[in-house]
Amino acid sequence: MSSDYQLLDFGDHEKIEMFGGTVVRRETPSAIGELGLPRQESELSFRLGRHLSQGKASSEGKSSHGKGSWTGQASATWRTKICDLTFSLRQTPTGQVGVFPEQAHNWNWIAELPDRMQGMKALNLFAYTGGTTMALAGKGVEVVHVDAAKSVVSWARENASLSGFADAPIRWIVEDVMLSLIHI
């Protein structure tokens, strides 16, 4: 599976990642321990090329617990490929960029499932920007994609289009998951 994501380092409640040539340093409360790279190397890897910083590592020097401003030199949006799925990424106020790369193992697992999934149906709740939806669509599964945020569902549709699933049998629902379960 093709991927241009790389986890460069994590610790001190932050992680440093590369998404499609853009290095992102962002606050991550679960990244405990110390950064694996010496601080100088970590700073150097961050300074190379396009980069973004959020929260703790921001130029304001204060921790924002995931709700900070972004600083750095990068496009407002950029793309990355994980498991042959293309994601449009952008900076959000919550410190997210539009993909959870740790889900790649699940997407690979789906891709390796037998082709007899063709025509099956799946319900993807809290579906965010569509990684699992696209992985299932790639196996010919009819997917109901549910998320409460209209902007996130639009973002997922954009990702599906970028990944070649614009015409896949995906039903896009903007609704609170609990309400959606009552209606489905």
Model-based region annotation:
Residues M1-G11, K15-F19, D84-F87, Y128, ...:
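Aromatic-residue detector
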Residues S3-E17, V24-P101, N108:
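Non-catalytic substrate-recognition/targeting regions of SAM-dependent transferases
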Residues F100-A104, E175-L179:
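Conserved phosphate-coordination/catalytic loops
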Residues A111-M178:
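Conserved SAM/SAH cofactor-binding pocket of Class I
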Residues I182-I184:
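Conserved small/polar residues in nucleotide/adenosyl-binding loops
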